[in-house]
From Swiss-Prot:
Homodimer. It comes from Thermoanaerobacterium thermosaccharolyticum (strain ATCC 7956 / DSM 571 / NCIMB 9385 / NCA 3814 / NCTC 13789 / WDCM 00135 / 2032). This is Lactate racemase. Was originally shown to use Ni(2+) as a cofactor, but in fact, the cofactor is a (SCS)Ni complex, a nicotinic acid mononucleotide derivative that is covalently attached to Lys-184 and forms a tridentate pincer complex that coordinates nickel through one metal-carbon and two metal-sulfur bonds. Keywords: Isomerase, Metal-binding, Nickel. Ni(II)-pyridinium-3,5-bisthiocarboxylate mononucleotide binds at residues 72-75, 184, 200.
């Protein structure tokens, strides 16, 4: 008997599985990756040895208006560690620079003051200049080019007006951009809603290269790279974290070169080989990534990659924030089945993309080929049902439901943290 723990909200769900039922337990190697350095020292080492560019302190010398793009409340970037070190590096040769910290919300809701203090610490919030990006506020946007896809590249004016643009973030597998981090700080991070919608169109989401761990020929990534170049993103600090959100590696320097090095590292530790199973049990990595159903689609894509067609995906996600997007929810609430959702989305052109359409498209793709059971807070049960999934109170109940759909002795793949792995079929 194997005891399995799955991240769920700010805690974990534990359950036992007979050894003979387990086809594979698929984990990123990040959890076992050993570093004999403190998190601070890992970041300092990266800042002192930038990839493809000068040190940040040298780039900052003589600059008057510096903007640091950081991640919002939905991302587990350990900014309490990284931001002070970035600020210190900038101020080593430029104590008088005006530094603004721009929170990249992308298409998410704005980060609240309470969430800012929880993420960055009260001292930092009270003593530094923070600005929350609002993709819907057209007055704060500036047109700086046309994306390879044809969409208008509009980003926050603060970034355009900066004489040095820096970004921090983290690199993990991403379910349609290939990997997070790097260029994503610009698009979707600080882009306008119209720009984000064009980049996330149904044509691109459908593209077979718009998948986890894939950058080459990925049209979404191609747009993002262009956006970072046009925005003059001069320096990045991207970290890699384990399942406890501890820093295990860091990459700093040129926005594309440093990011690619980081992606290579993540690919090495995150790629798992799986034989598809009838049942897959996974999660969205716990808080803050499982705050809503919308975000939890990411974890489901790992389940999709490790599950047979017609199989069952069980995802544990607390979803304290509910469905996470009215537009996303309505795609399902107002459709007769997942195929109906997909047909409606694919009928929309590149310039007709609606808010949250991409997440609905990916969830519909999963639901067309698999049953999904969601272990979540009971307040979400109606949402889950409306979205053609089945709610369950715990993993035991979820497994019983799954076994009523497939055989009782079906093999099971377990992916404790679905957002941390790149699943490749054996």
């Amino acid at each position: 008997m194997a005891n399995i723990e799955i991240p769920y909200g700010k805690s974990k769900l534990a359950f036992d599985l007979p050894d003979e039922r387990i086809q594979g337990i698929l984990r990123s190697k990040a959890g076992s990756y050993k570093v004999n350095m403190s998190e601070e020292d890992i970041v300092k080492r990266a800042l002192e040895n930038p990839i493809g560019t000068k040190r940040l302190q040298d780039l900052a010398e003589g600059k008057k208006n510096i903007v640091i793009i950081t991640s919002d409340h939905t991302r587990p970037v350990p900014s309490r560690i990284t931001l002070p070190l970035l600020l210190d590096e900038i101020r080593k040769k430029n104590k008088s620079a005006n530094v603004k910290i721009l929170i990249a919300t992308g298409f998410h809701r704005g980060t609240t003051l309470q969430e800012m203090k929880a993420k960055f610490g009260e001292d930092l919030v009270e003593n530094e200049q923070f600005v929350v990006h609002d993709s819907r506020n057209s007055e704060n946007m500036e047109l700086i080019g046309t994306l390879p896809s044809g969409g208008k590249l509009e980003i926050n004016k603060l970034a355009v007006e900066a004489d040095l643009l820096v970004a921090e973030g983290f690199i993990e597998p991403h379910f349609f951009a290939g990997f997070s981090g790097g260029r994503k700080s610009i698009l979707p991070g600080i882009a306008s809603v119209q720009c984000i919608l064009a980049n996330h169109c149904s044509e691109f989401i459908k593209n077979p290269y718009a998948r986890t761990g894939v950058l080459e020929n990925n049209p979404i990534h191609r747009d993002m790279i262009y956006a970072a170049k046009k925005a003059n993103l001069a320096f990045i600090l991207n970290v890699v974290i384990d399942s406890s959100h501890k820093i295990v590696n860091a990459f700093a320097g040129h926005s594309e070169k440093a990011h690619l090095k980081g992606c290579e590292f993540v690919s090495e530790i995150a790629t798992v080989n799986a034989k598809p199973a009838d049942i897959v049990i996974t999660s969205n990595g716990g808080y803050p990534l499982d705050q809503n159903i919308y975000q939890s689609v990411k974890g489901m894509t790992a389940g999709e990659a490790a599950c047979k067609d017609g199989g069952v995906i069980i995802i544990a996600a607390e979803c304290a924030d509910g469905h996470g997007g009215e537009g996303f929810y309505r795609w399902f609430k107002e459709s007769k089945d997942p195929q109906d959702v997909m047909n409606k989305i694919l009928s929309r052109g590149r310039d007709e993309t609606l808010p949250d359409q991409w997440e609905a498209q990916i969830l519909a793709r999963i639901l067309i080929n698999h049953k999904v059971i969601m272990v979540t807070d009971s307040k979400n049960y109606e949402y889950v049902k409306d979205m053609f999934m089945t709610p369950a109170k715990d993993l035991g109940e979820a497994l019983k439901i799954a076994e009523s759909i497939v055989n009782n002795d079906s093999k099971i793949n377990v992916i404790p943290d679905g957002v941390s792995v790149i699943v490749r079929e054996k």
